[in-house]
Amino acid sequence: TIALGFVLALVAALVLPSIGRFNIPELTVWLHVISGITWVGLLYYFNFVQVPAMGEALADEGGPGPAAIGKYIAPRALLWFRMSAAATWLTGAYALENVGGFVAAFMFAPGLQMIGLGAWLGTIMLFNVWVIIWPNQQKILGIKEASAEEIAKAKFTAAMASRTNVVL
């Protein structure tokens, strides 16, 4: 379905007369929006679907437990989560350079204050994903060896960073 979306966008870009020619800055913004939707969608999935489902699966004594989620779903979802976070930030950085400057936006230059705020929030969120959430999820999912105490701490830390991203 993602590939079909790209194909349809390419067809629209080639067919619609208003576009006229291939436009890298507009493509970058489009990719920024698509990757941002993917990132935030997965963020909401983790916070509002997977985390509560894991708790229910742990409490369900007669059920299959949370193993399938932890073994098959979470690693794949976390891969898309990390990659969409990186793609969102990188395409956003390129788009910022096209509208007045990457550094100017981060410095809240006149006319770039709101986009600069968004850039800072996105940067904090990216940091949370790669520096806090992902290393702790590796412990939780057994990708990185950790004691039971370290896993308990990792669950709390990852959850707080993820919830912070929901607020941002």
Annotate each predicted stretch with a short phrase.
Residues T1-L168:
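Polytopic transmembrane helical bundles with strong interfacial aromatic enrichment
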